[in-house]
């Protein structure tokens, strides 16, 4: 038997006492009273904060939204099918945050920034809160750089600047998503990070958009955040904020970002569902009272940062769907009042074959020509005026039988200008191509052509300029001004090509 000395025993006991750590861990715990429809009512959780994450026994996470006198109403970020009445819930002490990094470019993620494209985990460099405060007044500067969409109708008459919020609004199936996707495709080589947020859409539609990005090489600078129609309402409500947090990560690193929310009507519906199930009082159209704040705090995060913060920017293009062209409904009026202008897409124009179906009369950009290069200002000034006069004349001409020659000429010019604004989907044009196209139309060079020949002629003219007058594009790109030399080159190209075109058409 081993002899143990008494002093050894006392030293062992002393060591054990020294190592004893009297740390009391307080865990805030509650009990599920009721669960269903993506909502849980919890008893207890006395110290929980509004918006705090809570964790259920099965690992499902929820957000505590309603703090009432006798219970807590939490929304579930998952289906929560295995949560039972009486199971325990613990408060985590955290609020919703997501991992962010450059590695997110080219990936498809959900509202919790977890990959859903089957390409493996995404390494994160830091975390950002999903709900971050928007930059203050001192942190911003006014919008002055153009964000080219590649669509003539927008870049010439409803220009968008970097840091602006421009609403795309219209009925279903009028090409709202197409305008947004063309804008993303046009950012290729512009050093702009794009974020496309799909809220409550069909999974097939999202897959189609991702395929378009892949085919056109746009996915390398784009992040897709998708919560489809079968996702829980909580995740559909969070998806836009997740997209904004990802875009902010790049904005604060001195980069330019573009974010598309497709669409905010579905987010408002998801929020309405959550609010009604939480028994919050309904307001107009059964939306809760804070639905304005839902969108304003999201869209205020788009900004052009001041030079002290590195001049990064976040341009937001929210999409809102109207019912039968009713712009005076609750959500459309709210978002119109928050944004810096709107692009209105009309079902009638779309069905008449005018695509993109932009109603230039009621579409506006509240930033205006500050978001255009000088060359575009020089040629596009007349375009909007001529189109407005044409629309007025066209309405009048329906009732008048004999029109004088000047009116007939103006109507003919207007028809050709309208033809000039038509563009195929996924075919954005560079600024110099747009300038050449607009100049040709406004200065009457298209008047000698039939309306049906305009599109073909303009496509050939743009090709002719690239091959025979490459200096034109170089001047516009380098000086950003429509100089006399550029105008002369363009005039030469137009006159040379019109002769050639008419000769070929006669054959």
UniProtKB/Swiss-Prot annotation:
Q: Entry's PROSITE patterns?
A: ATPASE_ALPHA_BETA
List the EC numbers from the record: 7.1.2.2
Membrane topology term: Peripheral membrane protein
Quick check: keyword Cell inner membrane in the entry? Answer: no
Which Gene3D superfamilies does this one have? 2.40.30.20, ATP synthase alpha/beta chain, C-terminal domain, P-loop containing nucleotide triphosphate hydrolases
> Where mainly located?
plastid
- What GO MF terms are annotated? ATP binding; proton-transporting ATP synthase activity, rotational mechanism
Its UniProt entry gives the catalysed reaction(s) as: ATP + H2O + 4 H(+)(in) = ADP + phosphate + 5 H(+)(out)
Extract one GO cellular component term from the record.
Answer: proton-transporting ATP synthase complex
Xref: PANTHER family = ATP SYNTHASE SUBUNIT ALPHA, MITOCHONDRIAL
Q: What is the protein name stated in its UniProt record?
A: ATP synthase subunit alpha, chloroplastic
Species the sequence originates in = Marchantia polymorpha
Tell me the gene name: atpA
């Amino acid at each position: 038997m081993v002899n143990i000395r008494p002093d050894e025993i006392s030293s062992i006991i002393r060591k054990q006492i020294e190592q004893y750590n009297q740390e009391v861990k307080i865990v805030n715990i509650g009990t599920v009273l009721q669960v269903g429809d993506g909502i849980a009512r919890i008893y207890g959780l006395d110290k929980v904060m509004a918006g705090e994450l809570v964790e259920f026994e099965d690992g499902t996470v929820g957000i505590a939204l309603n703090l009432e006198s006798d219970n807590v109403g939490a929304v579930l970020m998952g289906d929560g099918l295995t949560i039972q009445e009486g199971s325990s819930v613990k408060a985590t002490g955290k609020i919703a945050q997501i991992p962010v990094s450059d590695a997110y470019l080219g990936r498809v993620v959900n509202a919790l920034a977890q990959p859903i494209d089957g390409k493996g985990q995404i390494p994160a460099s830091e975390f950002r809160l999903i709900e971050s405060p928007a930059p203050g007044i001192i942190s911003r500067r006014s919008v002055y750089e153009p964000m080219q969409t590649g669509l003539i109708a927008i870049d010439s008459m409803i220009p968008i600047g970097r840091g602006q919020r421009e609403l795309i609004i219209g009925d279903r199936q009028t090409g709202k998503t197409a305008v947004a996707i063309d804008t993303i495709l046009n950012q290729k080589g512009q050093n702009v990070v794009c974020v496309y947020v799909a809220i409550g859409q069909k999974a097939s539609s999202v897959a189609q958009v991702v395929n378009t990005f892949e085919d056109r090489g746009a996915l390398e600078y784009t992040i897709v955040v998708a919560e489809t129609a079968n996702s829980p309402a909580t995740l559909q409500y969070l998806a836009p904020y997740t997209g904004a947090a990802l875009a902010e990560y790049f904005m604060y690193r001195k980069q330019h970002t573009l974010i598309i929310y497709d669409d905010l009507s579905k987010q408002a519906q998801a929020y309405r569902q959550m609010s009604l199930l939480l028994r919050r009082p309904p307001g107009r159209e059964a939306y809760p009272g804070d639905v304005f704040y839902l969108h304003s705090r999201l869209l205020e995060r788009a900004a052009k940062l001041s030079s002290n913060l590195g001049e990064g920017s976040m341009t937001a293009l929210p999409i809102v769907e109207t019912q039968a062209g009713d712009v005076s409904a609750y959500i459309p009026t709210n978002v119109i009042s928050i944004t810096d202008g709107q692009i209105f897409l009309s079902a009638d124009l779309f069905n008449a074959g005018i695509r993109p179906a932009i109603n230039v009369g009621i579409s506006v950009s509240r930033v205006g020509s500050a978001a255009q290069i000088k060359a575009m200002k020089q040629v596009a000034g007349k375009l909007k005026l001529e189109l407005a006069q044409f629309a007025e004349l066209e309405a009048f001409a329906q009732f008048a039988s004999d029109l004088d020659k000047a009116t007939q000429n103006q109507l003919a010019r207007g028809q050709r200008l309208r033809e000039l604004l038509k563009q195929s989907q996924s075919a954005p044009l560079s600024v110099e191509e747009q300038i050449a196209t607009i100049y040709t139309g406004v200065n009457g060079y298209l008047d000698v052509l039939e309306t049906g020949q305009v599109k073909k002629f303009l496509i050939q003219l743009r090709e002719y300029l690239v091959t025979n007058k490459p200096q034109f594009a170089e001047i516009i790109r380098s000086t950003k001004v429509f100089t006399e030399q550029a105008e002369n080159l363009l005039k030469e190209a137009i006159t040379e090509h019109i002769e050639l075109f008419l000769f070929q058409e006669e054959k």
